[in-house]
Amino acid sequence: MKTSGGSDAAKRRAGESAAETVTDGEVVGLGTGSTAAHAIRRLGDRVDSGLDIRGVATSFASRELAAECGIPLLDLDEAVGSDATGIDIAIDGADQVAVGEGESEVGPLIKGGGAAHAREKLVDASADRFLVVADPSKETPVLNRSVPVEVLPAGRSAVAEAVRAAGGEPTLRRAERKDGPVVTDNGNLVLDCAFGEIADPDALSTTLSTTPGVVEHGIFVGLADEVHVGTETGVRVARR
C-alpha cells in the first residue's frame, strides 16, 4: 500500500535533483509514485527547452504523465532489445530506504506501494544507473515495512503459506475505489507481507524470488546507485 509522509516540497526537490542529472540523448526509466512524478515533470520542462531524451515508463500512470509532459516514449523491448542502446538511467521512488552510517550509504529498498514493482524492478535493473528519489520520512536504519509481493491469482494461497513459513504475515491488498482486490498492470494480485524488522534483506529477497507463484517482490537489493533525499532546505545525495 502507498505510504504517506514528507512534504510535497521535499519530494519535489528530490525528484528535480535526479532529473537534472539526465543528459542529452539518454534513454530514461520513468518511475512510479508521487516523488518520481516530480522528476517526470521536470524532465518534461527540460524537453520543452530542447533536451533530447526518450523515456521508458514503469507503469500505466507514469506513461500517462510522461505523455502529458511531452516526453517521447519507448517500450521496454525497444529500449533493451538486441539493436537498442539500453536504458542509461532510471529514476524511481521508494516506500522505504535503509540508510547507513552518516546517512551516506546506499542500502536496500522496499518498493511496490503503487503495485508497479514488477515492472519497476525490470526497468531499474536494466538501467546503467538507478537513482532513487525520496523524502526523509522514507529513511530507516532497518527495513521494517510490509513487503509487497505480486502473485499469480491461482498461486495466492500457496504463496501466503510460504510467506507464513518464512515468518511473515500476508494480507491481500484491497482496492480503495472498487470492491475486491488490487489487480496489477500485469493482471496479478498483491500480498502485503509483514516480516517486522528485516535483518537480512538479501536472504528474504532470495526466499521470495524462489517461491513458486511469486511474480516479483518489492525488496530491491544492490540496485540503487544514488539516493536523492529531498529536505525542507535542499537535497542530500548518497552514492554507492
From Swiss-Prot:
Transmembrane segments: none annotated. Keywords: Isomerase. Gene3D superfamilies: 3.30.70.260, 3.40.50.1360. It comes from the Archaea. GO terms for biological process: D-ribose metabolic process; pentose-phosphate shunt, non-oxidative branch. One of its GO terms (molecular function) is ribose-5-phosphate isomerase activity. It holds the Pfam family Rib_5-P_isom_A. Signal peptide: none annotated. Pathway: Carbohydrate degradation; pentose phosphate pathway; D-ribose 5-phosphate from D-ribulose 5-phosphate (non-oxidative stage): step 1/1. The active site is at E120 (proton acceptor). It catalyses: aldehydo-D-ribose 5-phosphate = D-ribulose 5-phosphate. Substrate binds at T32, G33, S34, T35, D92, G93, A94, D95, K111, G112, G113, G114, K138. Homodimer. Catalyzes the reversible conversion of ribose-5-phosphate to ribulose 5-phosphate. This is Ribose-5-phosphate isomerase A.
